[in-house]
């Protein structure tokens, strides 16, 4: 959702578009061309495709299917797709059939108060819908192949994040917890990062949940949690 009243307060897509650093939509053929070159020239091992949160009932799943089909036709490259819960769980199998091997559906925040304040558009999708979608997606992609971003430092407490991470891990969803980093030009540009102590206390608690439920980032086929560059969670698995 790209309207100011409903957009995620941390999102910089509009700034990137305004500054000419990206285009509104990368066509499937463009993605396939770049993916093939990335594998051949830079030995890239996996790819992430995301749509933001388009105002369509499929929440971007249709364009992800089209794009993944183009890429996997051109090159053998594991793909993680990222979207919000679509209107129909049948989209998960369609994504899998198009070549997507891992899926991200991102909570960002874990309590309703923070969700309403930080991302009013995404907050219109209730947490219980996320969990019904998580359960359906895990049936298609497998345990540990579905993940969700959680941004620590937006206002959720340590306990709230740890408890949500345990709930997610218990159903086979990898809770990829990362410290919030403000981006210039966004409404949260002046919002503080979480302090080191907060993250140092939080990571071991999440790591315990990952071990308890047999989830490990190295086993993820593709995506952000597999890379892990923006979080220290890998060191606590």
Task: For every predicted segment, state its role.
Residues 1-16, 223-235:
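Local cysteine-cluster metal-coordination motifs and their immediate loop/turn environment
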Residues 7, 43-45, 99, 142, ...:
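Short loop/turn motifs at secondary-structure junctions
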Residues 12-31, 38-91, 95-133, 147, ...:
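Core AdoMet radical
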Residues 52-57, 85-88, 153-157, 226-231:
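Short, internal active-site loops enriched in acidic
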Residues 80-86, 134-159, 178-182:
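Conserved strand-turn element in the central/C-terminal portion of the radical SAM core barrel
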Residues 121-128, 152-159, 194-197:
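A short glycine-/small-residue-rich loop at the edge of a beta-strand within enzyme catalytic domains
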Residues 136, 140, 159-237:
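Auxiliary Fe-S-binding modules of radical SAM enzymes
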């Amino acid at each position: 959702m790209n309207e100011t009243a409903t957009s995620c307060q941390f999102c910089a897509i509009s700034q990137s578009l305004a500054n000419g650093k990206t285009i509104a939509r990368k066509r499937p053929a463009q993605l396939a061309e770049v993916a093939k070159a990335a594998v051949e020239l830079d030995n890239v091992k996996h790819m992430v495709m995301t749509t933001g949160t388009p105002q369509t009932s499929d929440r971007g799943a249709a364009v992800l299917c089209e794009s993944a089909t183009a890429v996997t036709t051109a090159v053998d490259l594991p793909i993680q797709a990222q979207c919000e819960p679509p209107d129909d769980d049948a989209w998960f199998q369609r994504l899998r059939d198009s070549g997507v091997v891992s899926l991200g559906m991102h909570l960002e925040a874990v309590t309703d108060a923070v969700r309403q304040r930080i991302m009013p558009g995404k907050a219109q999708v209730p947490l219980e819908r996320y969990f019904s979608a998580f359960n359906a997606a895990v049936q298609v992609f497998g345990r540990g192949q579905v993940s969700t971003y959680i941004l620590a430092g937006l206002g959720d407490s340590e306990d709230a994040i740890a408890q949500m991470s345990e709930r997610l891990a218990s159903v086979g969803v990898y809770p990829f917890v990362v410290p919030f980093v403000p981006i210039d030009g966004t409404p949260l540009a002046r919002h503080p990062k979480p302090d080191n102590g907060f993250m140092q206390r939080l990571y071991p608690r999440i790591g315990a949940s990952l071990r308890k439920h047999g989830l490990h980032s190295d086993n993820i086929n593709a995506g952000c949690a597999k890379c892990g560059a923006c979080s220290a969670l890998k060191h606590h698995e």
